[in-house]
Structures are given as C-alpha cells and as structure tokens.
C-alpha cells in the first residue's frame, strides 16, 4: 500500500528520528534530586516522555505516569526550570539518531518532498540538536511544543503547515512513534505512519491505528513511492 499523492511529510523528533531519552533522563534525574525528590531512572523516563517537558517533570517528581495533585505549581515550575538548565548543559552528547534516519531523509529530500518537524519538545532546544546530528537542512519548518498554544495531539501545527504550504490533508503524512502523533494526524484528517520503536508509554503503536506501521524509517520510502 502506498500514498503516492503525498507532498508534505511532518516528522516527530524524540523517539522517531532521535533517541534522546539518555540525555532527558540525566537532566530529569538531576532536577528532581536537586529538589530533594527520589532519583528517576532512564527506564522510567522512557515511559514519562512524549507529552512535553512540563508533563515529564511532573511525572518524574511523582514517580508515576499520573502527576500527583500534591505537587504545587511553584514546585513543578522550579523543576522545569532546573530540567531546562541541566538539559542545556548536557550538550545532548548521549542522544543519537535511529538507524536509517539520515539516509531516509536524504532520499526524501532528493525526491522533492517538503519536510517539516513537529515536536512537543521545547523550541529552544531543537535547532541545536538538528544541527548537531546533521539533519537541520532537511526541514523547511521546525515547530516546537511551544510554537502554538496547544501541543500534539491537537492538530494546530499540522493545520498550520497545510495552510502555509497549500496542501490538502490527503497530501500530508505524519510520521511518529506515539499515540499523540497518530491522534494529531487523525485530528488533522491526514494519514499517519507509526514506528514500532520509540516512546509510547509501553503501548504498541498499532493500538492507535496508524495508516502504516513500520519497524524502520526506511520503510517510509516505499509508502510514498520513492524508488531506491
């Protein structure tokens, strides 16, 4: 099955193109411990990511996917501030691209597709990370989690892209690893390509019913009918 009319492809970042949890986990652990809360592990943080940094810190402080109502707004705000500082200081040295990512982006670029990045990650961290991993040149638009009032699964970023590039929903594809990515696509009326690796709170991506499910980003080339 292919989507031969696709013109615009929107990609998630964390868990889709980049395994960033090792750096996120270190920063989250440093932040919660600085506030006198118990340490969090990389394994825990793999479940906590996907809904933006504020939610990540709330979950880390709560040691749970459900954020404790006992946490004050001031405490969560301080935790977020500390997290941002520690994450910025990390230099993102532990993060790495998943296999086939750079090669796939290059082939899509050569084939003439318009590509955008739509992530719930805070915008200020994204350009440096894309440059560091040599993939910034592939994206005409980079939309962080604070680019609009609402994050994925709200479709506002995808709707904005369609309007900017004058494409119909049938001409756009959302590529991601989490329920939020697939729901954002459904809410925007466009097709979705779900990756089985990445971060989806322990739930198989197939449970969100994406239009396509793949174990590797390279399978996207076949979906959009790029000849190898």
UniProtKB/Swiss-Prot annotation:
| Cross-referenced Pfam families | HAD_2
An annotated GO cellular component of this protein is: cytosol
Q: Which domain of life is it from?
A: Bacteria
Catalyzed reactions per annotation = 2-phosphoglycolate + H2O = glycolate + phosphate
Q: Give, as in the UniProt entry, the pathway in which the protein acts.
A: Organic acid metabolism; glycolate biosynthesis; glycolate from 2-phosphoglycolate: step 1/1
Cofactors needed by this protein, per the record, are:
Mg(2+)
Does this entry carry the keyword Secreted?
A: no
- GO BP field: carbohydrate metabolic process; DNA repair; glycolate biosynthetic process
Family per record:
Belongs to the HAD-like hydrolase superfamily. CbbY/CbbZ/Gph/YieH family.
Protein function = Specifically catalyzes the dephosphorylation of 2-phosphoglycolate. Is involved in the dissimilation of the intracellular 2-phosphoglycolate formed during the DNA repair of 3'-phosphoglycolate ends, a major class of DNA lesions induced by oxidative stress.
Question: What's the protein called, per UniProt?
Answer: Phosphoglycolate phosphatase
**Which species does the entry assign this protein to?**
Vibrio parahaemolyticus serotype O3:K6 (strain RIMD 2210633)
The encoding gene: gph
């Amino acid at each position: 099955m292919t989507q031969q009319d696709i013109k615009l492809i929107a990609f998630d970042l964390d868990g889709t193109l980049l395994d960033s949890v090792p750096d996120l986990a270190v920063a989250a652990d440093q932040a919660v411990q600085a506030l006198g809360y118990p340490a969090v592990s990389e394994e825990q943080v793999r479940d906590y990511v996907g809904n933006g940094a504020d939610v990540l810190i709330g979950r880390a402080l709560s040691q749970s996917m459900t954020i404790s109502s006992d946490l004050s707004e001031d405490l969560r705000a301080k935790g977020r501030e500390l997290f941002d500082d520690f994450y910025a200081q990390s230099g993102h040295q532990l993060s790495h691209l998943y296999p086939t990512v750079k090669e796939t982006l290059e082939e899509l670029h050569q084939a003439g597709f318009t590509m955008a990045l739509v992530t719930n990650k805070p915008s200020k961290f994204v350009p440096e990370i894309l440059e560091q991993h040599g993939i910034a040149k592939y994206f005409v638009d980079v939309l962080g989690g604070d680019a609009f009032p609402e994050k994925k699964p709200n479709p506002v970023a995808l709707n904005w892209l369609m309007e900017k590039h004058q494409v119909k929903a049938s001409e756009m594809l959302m590529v991601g690893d989490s329920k939020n990515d697939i729901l954002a696509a459904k809410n925007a009326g466009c097709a979705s390509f779900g990756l089985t690796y990445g971060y989806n709170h322990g739930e198989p991506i197939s449970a969100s019913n994406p239009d396509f499910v793949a174990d590797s980003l390279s399978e996207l080339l076949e979906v959009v009918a790029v000849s190898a």
